[in-house]
């Protein structure tokens, strides 16, 4: 069986259209019988080991036609819209200037970043388990790890800050 948490390159439209099922104490999407998406903010009991899951991540390769200041205010500023009549011309320009081109609901989804509700659900799940788990499965990491691994080049986003809070409050069995 393959288990996974989502990251930032999943087709969230398709993933979130799947029925939600209970599995080993937490909510999942079953892609196939042996391919299972562990949803955000869930706790699973696998062979007596507790696993907290929290997927999601921000795409760091978005720039498009947005200015750096626009991207700092709203990282979605570099995303192209599929109904834009000039989309193919814009894509051509972006590709010739080595800019990453993403199209909403085609190659980029807003759902890549967790919502406040998902974050709250995760905190409530941990609280219900007395802030104890054996493992945390995530796609992204806490702010402190980002600083070390990113060499100071990456700025923490709300998910990194959330995972830092989880890291500080959680104890491991």
Regions found by a protein language model. Name each.
Residues 8-14, 43-44, 59-63, 142-147, ...:
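Active-site environment of divalent metal-dependent phosphoester hydrolases
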Residues 1-46, 156-157, 162-163, 168-169:
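Core catalytic region of metal-dependent phosphoesterases/phosphodiesterases
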Residues 26, 49-154:
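Active-site-proximal loop/helix segment associated with metal-binding centers of metalloenzymes
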């Amino acid at each position: 069986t393959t288990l996974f948490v989502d990251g930032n390159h999943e087709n969230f439209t398709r993933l979130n259209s799947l029925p939600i099922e209970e599995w080993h104490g937490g909510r999942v999407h079953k892609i196939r019988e042996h391919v299972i998406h562990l949803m955000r903010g869930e706790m699973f009991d696998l062979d007596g080991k507790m696993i907290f899951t929290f997927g999601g991540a921000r795409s760091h390769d978005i720039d498009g036609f947005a200015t750096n200041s626009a991207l700092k205010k709203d990282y979605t500023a570099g995303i192209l819209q599929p109904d834009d009549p000039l989309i193919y011309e814009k894509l051509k320009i972006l590709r010739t200037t080595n800019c990453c081109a993403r199209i909403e609901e085609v190659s980029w989804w807003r759902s890549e970043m967790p919502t406040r509700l998902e974050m709250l659900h995760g905190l409530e799940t941990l609280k219900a388990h007395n802030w104890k788990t054996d493992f945390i499965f995530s796609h992204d990491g806490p702010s402190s790890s980002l600083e070390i691994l990113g060499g100071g080049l990456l700025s923490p986003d709300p998910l990194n800050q959330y995972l830092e809070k989880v890291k500080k409050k959680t104890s491991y069995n």
